[in-house]
């Protein structure tokens, strides 16, 4: 397998404020978290883990041959949970890069994960995240995040508001991150910041501390399941692709 120095970690908590037991919701006959894991597994990476506080989630992943790392339910963010899981990976001294994939993207494309890894290894950036070019109509939902970048693709700011103001085309932020190990360790050591808490976007902690984030373009906006409405959208999407 390629990229033996990379760990892909999928954080998944059973409790969710907006959608009860979100990881266990069915899309077709398969749970959300199993779908995410199976999509990520298509990248064919040696070190792929689901990290969770739930025996039920663990049972689902182990049943399909996946590896699980248990982490405490009180960990505040997905990135914190990712780091705690990384510390528990056997022989983690051989892991130089960590990719954090949200556990609510049932149709995430494996090619996006591989693109992050390639860019992380071959660019000047220690943190990389994917973006998609979209029109205004596609990003107007409140949960969507846009990013402004410079001419080299370096992130300047992330916001839940549409940025830059007045534009006709935007960069939609896909909430997946690739970290060099040292960058993840540094991120975890920094306290939450004003802009992070204001926008409710933990990546702003990075920018506020003068750490660069590189962006790489990918082709499609993945469905993220946070609400019942999102779940129904995902179910409909699955039904449509199943007919093909």
From Swiss-Prot:
Pathway it works in: Nucleotide-sugar biosynthesis; CMP-3-deoxy-D-manno-octulosonate biosynthesis; CMP-3-deoxy-D-manno-octulosonate from 3-deoxy-D-manno-octulosonate and CTP: step 1/1; Bacterial outer membrane biogenesis; lipopolysaccharide biosynthesis
Name of the protein in question: 3-deoxy-manno-octulosonate cytidylyltransferase
Function: Activates KDO (a required 8-carbon sugar) for incorporation into bacterial lipopolysaccharide in Gram-negative bacteria.
GO cellular component, one term: cytosol
Entry keyword Transferase: yes
InterPro entries (alphabetical): Cytidylyl_trans, KdsB, Nucleotide-diphossugar_trans
EC main group: transferase
Gene Ontology BP terms: CMP-keto-3-deoxy-D-manno-octulosonic acid biosynthetic process; lipopolysaccharide biosynthetic process
CDD domains per record: CMP-KDO-Synthetase (cd02517)
Keywords from the UniProt entry: Cytoplasm, Lipopolysaccharide biosynthesis, Nucleotidyltransferase, Transferase
Xref: Gene3D superfamilies: Spore Coat Polysaccharide Biosynthesis Protein SpsA, Chain A (3.90.550.10)
Entry keyword annotation includes Transferase: yes
Similarity field: Belongs to the KdsB family.
Substrates-to-products reaction catalysed: 3-deoxy-alpha-D-manno-oct-2-ulosonate + CTP = CMP-3-deoxy-beta-D-manno-octulosonate + diphosphate
Gene Ontology molecular function terms on file: 3-deoxy-manno-octulosonate cytidylyltransferase activity
Compartments (UniProt record): Cytoplasm
Top-level taxon of origin: Bacteria
Record EC number: 2.7.7.38
